[in-house]
Amino acid sequence: MELKVETLDRRHALHTLFTHRVLVKGQDRQKNFVQLREWCWEMFGPGVERTLVWHAREDDKTLRYRWCWHIDPANESNLYLYFREETASAFFIRWCN
């Protein structure tokens, strides 16, 4: 499985909520993305599409999610997972060897 890990900073809109994002790459990226998303759901609880987090208000329950995902509509081969600090470590230990 080919993964590219990025640390989020001020260039990224959600850097105040999430610390890392992972781009799922490679020939089997769609299948791997679904597998990773299912694993995250089981390990960290429900997630949500990034767009919902992006447009959430401060009092919105959406901001409490520990992880989210994003499929880039401009390029559907860009499949991302976003993590808060506490979930990123567990993901990296399991998937980023």
Feature map (PLM): residue ranges:
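Short, compact, well-ordered microdomains
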Residues: 63-97
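The feature represents the first ordered module of a protein
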Residues: 1-73
